[in-house]
Amino acid sequence: MKLLHVAPSQGTVWVRKGFQVFGRQPLGFASLFAAGLFMSLLLGIIPVLGSIATLALAPAVSLVFMIASRRVATGQAAMPGAIVELFGAGRSRLVALLKLGLVYVAATFLLFWLAGVLDGGALASFFAGLRDSKLTPESAATRVAEPGVQLGLLLRLLFLGVLSIAFWQAPALVFWGDPGWAKSLFFSTVALWRNKGAFTIYSLVWLALFMVLLAIVSIGAGLFGPERFALVAAPLMLVFMTVFYASLWFTFADCFSSSDPVAASRGDDVDHPDPMKGTS
């Protein structure tokens, strides 16, 4: 695979294509997201190990959405083909994907431990205090505003952002390029750095859309009441998250070229996909 450079404006194109590909098969993507949500709920029943397993599966979840988007962009059904294609990748790729998941778990725990050391345990103490039956909303709001808690939140968000750079393209590189899990982390980091302009625009557009969605939810809750509008807000949030995952494929396909016609199918025209065509 060859690393490519894209213009910063391509970030907005990735978002648009996420909406386009979702619009072609909304039920397929919705069923995929529902399957992932159901799996995480099942794993959540298992104490400790369930949370670790859910975290370890994060790279695979992003990959299966990439597979689904590529399939839809090339005129195929998202489900159940995406799941079948994932498990049909071969033993070496699946093992590499599993290693990615385990590294992701280890790195997350390490970074969160470091954040806990740097904030003096303030955030952990805050969450422990939430279990206190005597805690009032006013006292909780006061504690959230404490510098240590704010630092803890900021550090964890920062560390997760840095971690996502290495893992953003890694699952797709393992699946379509097979460079091994360690090299995939390196190439993912290089790809995002080389195309930092496009990824910055991409992130800002998603942030702006999320703020608009929050404003809609806030206004709707004020007009119709939180309980009633929750019936609308929940599906809106789920669609937002699903479209975000659907757009991930295009961030990968534009950053890497391949001699494999299937791997090179980027859905340049979502309505009439050409497998040999690159995005622009």
Each predicted region: which residue ranges?
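Hydrophobic alpha-helical membrane segments
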Residues: 1-280
